[in-house]
Amino acid sequence: MTVTISSDALDFLLISAESSPDREICGLVLGEGDHIARLVPCSNVAAEPWHRFEIDPAALIAAHRAARSGGPAVIGHYHSHPTGLAEPSPRDAADAVPDGSIWLIAGGNRVTAWRAVAAGRRHGRFDPLDLACVDGMAAPQGEDSSRDFA
């Protein structure tokens, strides 16, 4: 299965990950089905953000409220592995809910896409997805956005 993302959004994710070498970055993936329309940067509120992420619950609630009001749906989230690979870790698998959501993981100057499922091929929780860049999609937005894509 292939997930689509804009080249600007992919660049944003790579640049954000590279600019945070000591902490995992994280955010929400908005869109429909396997079409990523927008990335929304969120604060990492994890107690140990250097090797774990937790999306700010207020940002998650706000995104779900916006979706109920006609905005794009939350279809997943993204995070980085500052010193690791762009692959789900055993910790990611332990924290993942097998709900079919998309996980984008940045690490080693790469971004990979995964679907959280029961009995996945990676750590029993994730199946790999192909990631295809397309242009003309909405750029990342959010309070932590460090680059202007307008």
Predicted regions and their residues:
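Conserved beta-strand-loop surface patch within small alpha/beta domains used
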Residues: 1-74, 82-150
